[in-house]
Amino acid sequence: MSEKRLQKREEISDEYKWKLEDMYETDELWEAECEKASQLAEKLSGFKGHLADSAATLLDFFKKQDELSYYLERIVVYANERSHQDTAVSKYQAYVSKAETLTVQASGALAFASPEILQIDDKRLESFYSESNELMHYKRAIDEIMRQKEHTLSAAEENILAQCGEMAAAPENIFSMFNNADIKFPYITDVEGNKIRITHGNFIDFLSSKDRSLRKQVFRGVYDSYKKWSNTVSMMYISKLKNDTFYARVRKYDSARAMYLSGGDIPESVYDNLIETVHAHLPALHRYMSLRKKLLGVEHLHMYDLFAPIVDNVQTTYTYDEAKKLVAKALEPMGDEYVSILKSGMESGWIDVYENENKRSGAYSWGAYGTHPYVLLNYADNLDSVFTLAHEMGHAMHTYYSNEHQSITYAGYLIFVAEVASTCNESLLMHYMLEHCEDENERKYLMTHFLDGFRTTLFRQAQFAEFEHIAHRKMQKGEPVTKDVLNELWHELNVQYYGPDMRVDDEISYEWMRIPHFYTPYYVYQYSTGYSAAVAFSKKILEEGKPAVDKYIGNFLCGGCSKNPIELLRSAGVDMSTPKPVDDALNVFEDYLKQFEAATK
């Protein structure tokens, strides 16, 4: 049995590590800022009962709240990123815990604010605005509070709910510990005779193997493991459904979906439009499954065949330096300024590039106001890693532009638009690579990568969205929600989405149990809507050039949360209140599918 040893962090060159010192030069400075934040939270609680006193008092409160947000963002990001670079360091585990405690303290200290602001009558507020031009800066923030008027409870009740926060997080925290630490998958023997334990990290790699018996072995190994724990995992999720139903009821929302979508001021019709439009295009996904079956040369297509390669990859490795150049070249349609900032970020401590022992898996972009964004990668010299770099730098550039052009009050863009900039970059990269590849086989390989991007993001996340909405509706109506009900629902959705050429294996009924996003309700649909908006923007940028780029950067990337997400996207040229962007994106999928069908005849 051979095993490649992961590098220790100190063995990796500093040029491939992020510079967290740009936030705090020393840990002592972080600790000092924690103390400042704690004291400021106490000061803010002293405003209780006085927000309606005068325009000056209300303004002072909002300014101090912004100051607290500034500290807390930095405190939380630094603690987590220090911990993520080496999760075995107990000092930084303690920092994460301290940051969480501070956040809860701040939440409790501010619990009085929204109910109190809601008690200020409209005439008095208008007189405050007349007295203070500075207070006008906070009008949108105040309007957002007023929008939640009928769903905000008394100060005492809000304080109780704030203190329930850690208890309410129990289903997610229990699932996270179970899924990341406790569940163990079996060992398998790979094609070279190595005995390897299946993990979350290598699961998809194994499912991407050309060896069908290995894929089947891994598939069954993972889902049989969840089956053993299925009663327990089901109860975790059912508890989450009960939580959501409780909070929706006490806050006087019609449903959990209405509650979660109200945070971003997203009409529920956007959710319904997505699922209905995806349903209308499912025949195209069924065609893709039929083509996959043909190209794999199998009598029956199974769920463990979804990631199997159907075209040989021509170039299997892309070094990190090659990836940086490729991404920068592909994003040239975004203009000189964008590319210049992008290149600078890739060279000046924004990115933690390579995997090391105990480093957090996956990839993300995260930053705090007042410092540059940070990107965590586990770069692996493959095509997926190149696209991940483009994706995460899309997030980072969005953060950079929003922070540069908005105050801290309105810099943080909302989840609904969070995946747009990242996926737009991926779309531009794919376009560039398809335009510049000369090898027909490489072109086919890239097309499968693009088509699978639609399958795993637009279609699959819509399937997730449909599952969690039906589950929440059942809970709200008082219908029985059990392990068997959830398993059957997930199985039926797989039959519907993948079509007649797919043999939907029994084991797939347990797949929903391994999806962490279900503990962040009504989140995943935004991957599908974001993907659709991104495809629309990339098309405009390539076809219209500078005018489209100027609107995209000036109105969207620089916009933060200065408008609600639908208005923000509309002002940049894409209207997500209609089914059109989703329909247009799925038409692009069908266009590429036709090209791929023709190329593989």
Language-model region placement:
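C-terminal, non-catalytic "cap/extension" segments appended to globular domains
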Residues: E11-I12, E25, A113, I117-I120, ...
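Long, K/E/R/D-enriched contiguous segments that form extended
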Residues: L295-P333, V339, Y374, H398, ...
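Catalytic zinc-binding patch centered on the HExxH motif and its immediate surroundings
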Residues: N313-Y318, I351-T371
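Conserved helix-loop functional segments at active or binding sites
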Residues: K329-S340, W366, H395, T399-S407, ...
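Short beta-alpha connecting loops at secondary-structure transitions
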Residues: Y374-N378, H405-I415, K444-G453, H472-K474
